[in-house]
């Protein structure tokens, strides 16, 4: 059992986040859910309120997302994923995140509604980007060029779109959600393959600069 008295406020936020999400199913992301979570976990309610000043929904949602990130990293470290193909690494990580929220669909739905509000858009994008970055790093991505950014932007888009399907999916075992996820990942993999082939061909094309140089200084 967690001894909440020994936790820093940052640690307390992460520790309480899963229980807040569970309470948000019924109460929404608000102070009622925060108090219920603290009581459920056996934490001091006043300290819990100190960890989440004003019980702001986005603060609680951000802590919840961070808790899912941490659980994902603990369950699927890079070494464990290394034996899988890149497609399966990404799918495994996204699937883990979906499984982590399988029984709290309504909390996810409410969270997405809060995150979609105009005043929360920038922070929501940042949170999505951060989670996508963690997934790519666990998958072994070391890109530092423009691919670093495009990969994360695309994965964040896939994940958010999959969550939108997830909260409305009544199929057994969320089969429709996983089918949607597979189609999106397959589409990206085909695009990446085509892009790699195109860039490979591009590298084989004669250099215009080299060609002009030869015209100016013909070989002897």
Model-derived features: positions:
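Long, charge-rich low-complexity segments
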Residues: 193-220
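Internal, conserved structured core segments that host functional sites
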Residues: 98-131
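Acidic/His metal-coordination segments adjacent to aromatic residues that form catalytic metal sites
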Residues: 79-83, 137-142
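C-terminal ligand-sensing/allosteric alpha-helical core of TetR-family HTH transcriptional regulators
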Residues: 71, 86-100, 127, 131-138, ...
């Amino acid at each position: 059992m967690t001894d909440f008295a020994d936790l820093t406020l940052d640690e307390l936020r992460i520790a309480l986040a899963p229980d807040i999400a569970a309470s948000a199913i019924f109460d929404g992301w608000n102070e009622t859910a925060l108090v219920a979570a603290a009581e459920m976990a056996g934490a001091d309610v006043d300290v819990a309120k100190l960890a989440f000043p004003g019980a702001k929904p986005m603060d609680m949602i951000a802590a919840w997302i961070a808790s899912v990130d941490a659980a994902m990293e603990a369950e699927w470290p890079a070494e464990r994923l290394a034996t899988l193909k890149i497609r399966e690494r990404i799918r495994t990580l996204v699937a883990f995140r979906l499984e982590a929220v399988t029984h709290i669909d309504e909390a996810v739905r409410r969270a997405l509604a809060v995150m979609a509000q105009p005043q929360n858009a920038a922070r929501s994008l940042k949170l999505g980007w951060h989670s996508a970055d963690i997934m790519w790093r666990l998958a072994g991505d070391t890109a530092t060029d423009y691919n670093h950014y495009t990969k994360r932007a695309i994965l964040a888009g896939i994940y958010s779109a999959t969550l939108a399907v997830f909260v409305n999916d009544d199929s057994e075992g969320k089969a429709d959600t996983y089918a949607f996820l597979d189609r999106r990942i397959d589409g990206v993999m085909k695009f990446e393959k085509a892009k790699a082939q195109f860039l490979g061909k591009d590298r084989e094309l004669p250099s215009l600069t080299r060609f002009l140089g030869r015209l100016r200084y013909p070989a002897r």
